């Protein structure tokens, strides 16, 4: 597999590199903005779970590029610096992080809070959906500390069977909640984005990160709050219909007959967790799984032998009572 294979399989990955974006997800935020005008009148924006920084790049151009705009990016992982973006390496579940955000805004609340974070998927869909829901609630919780009344909140969701619970929780705090699917988001993915506009918390609501919304105390956090009894959350497809299909493979031949040239990623990851494994593989030191058909008699004899069974069993146990 050559280094151009992903450019063929994922046109948005290729376009992101050609346009200087750190990740293909930049197109998702741009297409959401085309539909909802998220950046209109925004002077202070917060990007939660920001690494590697593609959404922060978009915010810095759309908000920070206005001269008076300010952008704060927050992530647990280190992120390469971006011009016009204030970076905080911190935990979004900590009150100190919320205070630091407000401090950078000189005591003023944010107009827009976005979160494109997602946990490492396990392949167990129920577990992945649950973990994503908890991450969204953590982002919502810190948003209640830093977002101004009437502000906007955009966060990634997984449209699982319990997504209606998330909608109802978000609807308590926002006058408008929609589910949006950008064109650059693969059709094969259950990923979508909750676009929440008009921040309007219940009367008497006091944000409290010491009792986060994700601690399962629904009786005190949600069930006692008054809100709509039945709301249908609209589903909106974002992006021009003529835009590229994120699930389609495109040719590398460019328009006008120009020759394709490979473009490296704009910003390689900083100290990724797989870096050590790549080094071991490159040096031929990475352990390989030994398949049964590859085992010879001699190689089997060299493998570590299990402990003698008499050291593990009561000597009174008869052989016919041992079930392996």
Curated annotation (Swiss-Prot):
Protein EC: 2.1.1.205
Binding site for S-adenosyl-L-methionine: 53, 55, 75, 91, 116
Subunit structure: Interacts with WDR6; the interaction is direct, and required for 2'-O-methylation of position 34 in substrate tRNAs.
Role played: Methylates the 2'-O-ribose of nucleotides at positions 32 and 34 of the tRNA anticodon loop of substrate tRNAs. Requisite for faithful cytoplasmic translation. Requires THADA for methylation of the cytidine at position 32 of the anticodon loop of substrate tRNAs. Requires WDR6 for methylation of the nucleotide at position 34 of the anticodon loop of substrate tRNAs. Promotes translation efficiency of the UUU codon. Plays a role in neurogenesis. Required for expression of genes involved in neurogenesis and mitochondrial translation and energy generation.
GO biological process terms on file: cytoplasmic translation; neurogenesis; wobble position ribose methylation
Name the UniProt record assigns to this protein: tRNA (cytidine(32)/guanosine(34)-2'-O)-methyltransferase
Record organism: Mus musculus (Mouse)
Gene3D superfamilies referenced in this protein's UniProt entry, alphabetically: Vaccinia Virus protein VP39 (3.40.50.150)
Cell location: Cytoplasm; Nucleus
GO CC annotations, alphabetized: cytosol; nucleus
Pfam entry (one): FtsJ
Protein family according to the UniProt entry: Belongs to the class I-like SAM-binding methyltransferase superfamily. RNA methyltransferase RlmE family. TRM7 subfamily.
């Amino acid at each position: 597999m050559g280094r151009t294979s992903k450019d063929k399989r994922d046109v948005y990955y290729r376009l992101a590199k050609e346009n200087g974006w750190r990740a293909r997800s930049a197109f998702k935020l741009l297409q959401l903005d085309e539909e909802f005008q998220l950046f209109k009148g925004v002077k202070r924006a917060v990007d939660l779970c920001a690494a590697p920084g593609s959404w922060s790049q978009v915010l810095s151009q759309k908000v920070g590029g206005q001269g008076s705009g300010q952008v704060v990016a927050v992530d647990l992982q280190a992120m390469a610096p971006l011009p016009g973006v204030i970076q905080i390496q911190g935990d979004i579940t900590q009150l100190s992080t919320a205070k630091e955000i407000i401090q950078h805004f000189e005591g003023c609340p944010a107009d827009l809070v976005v979160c494109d974070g997602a946990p490492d998927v396990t392949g167990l869909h129920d577990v992945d959906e649950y973990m994503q829901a908890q991450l969204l609630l953590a982002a919502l919780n810190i948003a209640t500390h830093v977002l101004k009344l009437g502000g906007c909140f955009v966060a990634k969701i997984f449209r699982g069977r319990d997504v209606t619970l998330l909608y109802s929780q978000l609807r308590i705090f926002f006058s408008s909640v929609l589910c949006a699917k950008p064109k650059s988001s693969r059709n094969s993915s259950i990923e979508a984005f909750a676009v929440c506009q008009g921040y309007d918390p219940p009367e008497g609501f006091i944000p409290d990160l010491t009792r986060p919304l994700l601690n399962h105390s629904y009786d005190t956090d949600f069930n006692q709050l008054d809100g709509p009894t039945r709301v249908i959350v609209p589903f909106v497809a974002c992006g021009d219909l003529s835009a590229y299909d994120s699930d389609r493979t495109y040719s590398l031949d460019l328009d006008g007959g120009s020759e394709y040239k490979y473009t490296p990623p704009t910003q390689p990851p900083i100290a990724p967790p797989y870096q050590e494994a790549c080094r071991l593989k490159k040096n031929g030191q990475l352990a390989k799984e030994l398949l049964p058909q590859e085992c010879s008699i001699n190689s089997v004899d060299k493998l570590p032998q299990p402990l003698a069974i008499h050291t593990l069993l009561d000597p009174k146990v008869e052989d016919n009572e041992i079930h392996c």
